[in-house]
């Protein structure tokens, strides 16, 4: 089966075709704001300008390879409403034109599914961290249950917020990681874990204040160590509670090598396995939407046109995972 997937929840517009074995074609066009963070309407305008040429290129690539597309998948949510609507409209038109099933995919679950596909993880506790989300999840009773999540802003949002406050370019995460490697000391910062949930807004504020008094490299290091320790603690608790012997890191912030190191060490100490997808599959990508659409279609799940409205606040635990 060949499925075309379209991702466009925020920054990255991407389209891909996959089958059960591999990614066949993938193309992307990324929105980069002139300054500051993401502007939803500007991002949607970017997507609307690029989605036609992007899809034509992917479809022509399929024709050149003699591939017949069996389904169209799209990111139905969560995400920025204007961006989601642009992608959903294109997906509906394409599914009708090709006369193939349409399937709306939960963006968060797509990160998990492509991670499992590409690493071989079977039943992991999942730390999902990105610019818009920070959650610890595990599959129980046919749904990806949220064991812990942010009480305010995501860890990716927190890193970008701090970066802007100290004049670092967007996206802030990679630059913070780079500066942290040259640190000489740890500066105590607020560590906020409440039960199974975490909070990052106070940490960002405290780090911005610390940057006025300490070397920026030390503040970046301390910010990373504190935030990531919070995430690792909750992931370990979820593994114990859900009795999982595997952990997997997904989402754009998961590309941070230090976070991967901390999770790997925790898993080694627990005698558990740690899985980390290739960097190309950590950020938002069309392949994850296409692959999740494929497993959904093979399990008998599709989305009627009349039910294909976008869901900006689509919760991970709302989805019945029939294919797992």
UniProtKB/Swiss-Prot annotation:
One of its GO terms (molecular function) is N(6)-L-threonylcarbamoyladenine synthase activity. GO terms for cellular component: cytoplasm; EKC/KEOPS complex. Its EC number is 2.3.1.234. Fe cation binds at residues 107, 111, 128, 284. Binds 1 Fe(2+) ion per subunit. GO terms for biological process: tRNA threonylcarbamoyladenosine modification. CDD domains: ASKHA_NBD_Kae1_arch_bac. It catalyses: L-threonylcarbamoyladenylate + adenosine(37) in tRNA = N(6)-L-threonylcarbamoyladenosine(37) in tRNA + AMP + H(+). InterPro entries: ATPase_NBD (IPR043129), Gcp-like_dom (IPR000905), KAE1/TsaD (IPR017861), Kae1_archaea_euk (IPR034680). It is found in: Cytoplasm. Signal peptide: none annotated. It is an enzyme of class 2 (transferase). Substrate binds at residues 128-132, 160, 173, 177, 256. Pfam families: TsaD (PF00814). Its main location: cytoplasm. Monomer. Component of the KEOPS complex that consists of Kae1, Bud32, Cgi121 and Pcc1; the whole complex dimerizes. PANTHER family: TRNA N6-ADENOSINE THREONYLCARBAMOYLTRANSFERASE. Required for the formation of a threonylcarbamoyl group on adenosine at position 37 (t(6)A37) in tRNAs that read codons beginning with adenine. Is a component of the KEOPS complex that is probably involved in the transfer of the threonylcarbamoyl moiety of threonylcarbamoyl-AMP (TC-AMP) to the N6 group of A37. Kae1 likely plays a direct catalytic role in this reaction, but requires other protein(s) of the complex to fulfill this activity. Belongs to the KAE1 / TsaD family. This is tRNA N6-adenosine threonylcarbamoyltransferase. It comes from Methanothrix thermoacetophila (strain DSM 6194 / JCM 14653 / NBRC 101360 / PT). The lineage of its organism: Archaea, Methanobacteriati, Methanobacteriota, Stenosarchaea group, Methanomicrobia.
């Amino acid at each position: 089966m060949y499925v075309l997937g379209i991702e466009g929840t925020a920054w990255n517009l991407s389209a891909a075709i996959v089958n059960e074995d591999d990614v066949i074609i993938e193309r992307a066009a990324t929105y980069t704001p002139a300054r500051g963070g993401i502007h939803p309407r500007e991002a949607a305008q970017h997507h609307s300008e690029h989605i036609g040429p992007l899809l034509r290129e992917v479809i022509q690539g399929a024709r050149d390879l003699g591939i017949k597309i069996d389904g169209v998948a799209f990111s139905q949510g969560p995400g920025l409403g204007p961006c989601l609507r642009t992608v959903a409209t294109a997906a509906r038109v394409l599914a009708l034109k090709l006369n193939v099933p349409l399937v709306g995919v939960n963006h968060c679950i797509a990160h998990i599914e492509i991670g499992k596909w590409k690493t071989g993880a079977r039943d992991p506790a999942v730390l999902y961290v990105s610019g818009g989300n920070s959650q610890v999840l595990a599959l129980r009773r046919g749904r990806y249950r949220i064991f812990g999540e942010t009480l305010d802003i995501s860890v990716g949002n927190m890193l970008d917020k701090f970066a802007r406050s100290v004049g670092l370019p967007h996206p802030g995460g990679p630059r913070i990681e780079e500066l942290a490697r040259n640190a000489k000391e740890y500066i105590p910062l607020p560590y906020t874990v409440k039960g199974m949930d975490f909070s990052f807004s106070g940490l960002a504020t405290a780090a911005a204040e610390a940057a006025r008094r300490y070397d920026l490299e030390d503040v970046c290091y301390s910010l990373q160590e504190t935030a990531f320790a919070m995430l690792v603690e909750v992931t370990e608790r979820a593994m114990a509670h859900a009795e999982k012997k595997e952990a997997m890191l997904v989402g754009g912030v998961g590309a941070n090598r230090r976070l991967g190191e901390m999770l790997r060490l925790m898993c080694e100490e627990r005698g558990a396995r740690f899985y980390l997808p290739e960097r190309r599959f950590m950020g938002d990508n069309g392949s994850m939407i296409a692959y999740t659409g494929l497993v959904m279609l093979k399990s008998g799940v599709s989305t009627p046109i009349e039910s294909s409205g976008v869901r900006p606040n689509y919760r991970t635990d709302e989805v019945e995972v029939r294919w797992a």
